[in-house]
A protein has these predicted regions:
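Intrinsically disordered, low-complexity segments enriched in small/polar residues
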Residues: 2-55, 99-148
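Extracytoplasmic
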Residues: 47-49, 57-59, 69, 77-79, ...
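Short beta-strands and strand-coil junctions in structured, solvent-facing domains, enriched
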Residues: 60-61, 145
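Mature extracytoplasmic domains of secretory-pathway proteins
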Residues: 61-107
Length: 148
């Protein structure tokens, strides 16, 4: 009997030291955004055709893919436009992987949206290898643009 009382007291004492901590999936307690891959980088109008403009500012040759197509090249200092048409949309709207040829460099994507023309400019640069790298531009069914 005495051991049950001691065990119960020890458990209650241990629980007193626990503090609630917000999980990663919870909204920020200060009402603002917390940076991370789960936050959209941009927003587009998903009721109109979307133009993705890829700008290669890495100093390296890149390759990118589109659903149902083979890899295409994006040479140093060039840009390519990818049209995402309404008829192409199923659950998610677009997933465009972009990598350096051979996957040898860490990349970073910066976004700029022209809401009048529904143009998303993706500026691709090199990033510090110690940071997480961007590998794909993803647009979901609500028009939110993410880097993964």
């Amino acid at each position: 009997m005495k051991s049950k009382i001691i065990a119960t007291a020890a458990i209650l004492a241990a629980l007193a030291f626990l503090h609630p901590h917000p999980a990663l999936s919870q909204p920020a307690t200060d009402g603002g955004k917390k940076t991370g891959f789960w936050q959209p980088q941009a927003q587009v109008d998903n009721t109109r055709n979307i133009t993705l403009r890829l700008l290669n500012e890495t100093g390296l040759n890149l390759e990118y893919g589109q659903s149902g197509a083979s890899l295409s090249s994006l040479p140093v200092g060039t840009s390519k436009n990818i049209i995402v048409r309404i008829s192409n949309r199923t659950g998610d709207i677009a997933n465009i992987p972009i990598n350096s040829t051979g996957g040898t460099a860490t990349l970073k994507y910066d976004y700029n949206v022209d809401s009048q023309t529904n143009l998303v400019t993706v500026r691709i640069t090199r990033s510090d290898p110690r940071t997480s790298q961007d590998r794909s531009v993803y647009i979901d069914e609500k028009g939110r643009v993410y880097s993964f």
